[in-house]
Amino acid sequence: MHLHYDLPYPKHDMTDEPVSFFTYPPDSDTKFIPKDPCVHKPLSIKQVMERKLHWITLGGQYDWTNRVYPGERPPEFPRDVAGLLETLFPETLAQAAIVNFYTPGDTMMMHRDVSEETDKGLVSLSMGCDALFMIAPNDVGKMSEEDRPGHGEKEHLLLRIRSGDAIYMTQEARYAWHGVPKVLKGTCPDYLEDWPAEDGKYEEWQGWMKNKRINLNVRQMRDC
């Protein structure tokens, strides 16, 4: 969103508490102001947090225009998240990630992750609502036109992914076609439904997570 809007980042107070957009109440007058009002309209905090925010990036910032990872030193990947992931999946260094925010009705089209300069595995962690995850053959060059993703029936595997599940795509699966055709409403675990309203904070956002799926998709950009 930073390409099209001036983001109203919350200010730090005198404590060491991390700041969050959840600091603003849903009915806040604070707006995301468009850089070009002729193209985009102002957005409220509620509009952004409930529907308009679809993804953020961590670590290496992918250049979506040129389909490459920039050569300069990337922002540091969050150490606590990297430590957890590299303990579970030691063969992949957590260098870049896309955090997707899904609401029931959202989908992710079939695609392949081929921009990384390494064949290290992809890590996908899910939180919140269940989703259907589809994975299909990666050798599209040997498939008939009718069998290619998006063209009728084809060989594929369909998995139901629940909160806390992890998928590690490596070896033959590393470059496979994959996507999310459906997010299942009302399937968020009870213990997550009230997040981020915990410990007396962000109470006005209670229930935000109830119809959300958050997917952390992590990859190593290049061999070290």
From Swiss-Prot:
Top EC class for this record: oxidoreductase
Keyword annotations of the record: Dioxygenase, Iron, Metal-binding, Oxidoreductase, Virulence
A biological-process GO annotation: DNA repair
GO cellular component: a single term: cytoplasm
Gene3D superfamilies: Alpha-ketoglutarate-dependent dioxygenase AlkB-like
One Pfam family of this chain: 2OG-FeII_Oxy_2
Record: residues binding Fe cation: H111, D113, H178
Reaction equations catalysed: an N(6)-methyladenosine in mRNA + 2-oxoglutarate + O2 = an adenosine in mRNA + formaldehyde + succinate + CO2
Role noted for this protein: RNA demethylase that regulates the stability of mRNAs through an m(6)A-dependent manner. M6A is a modification present at internal sites of mRNAs and some non-coding RNAs and plays a role in mRNA stability and processing. Demethylate m6A at position A1935 within the 3'UTR of transcription factor ZAP1 and plays an important role in C.parasitica development and virulence.
Name this protein carries in UniProt: N6-methyladenosine RNA demethylase ALKBH
Protein's gene: ALKBH
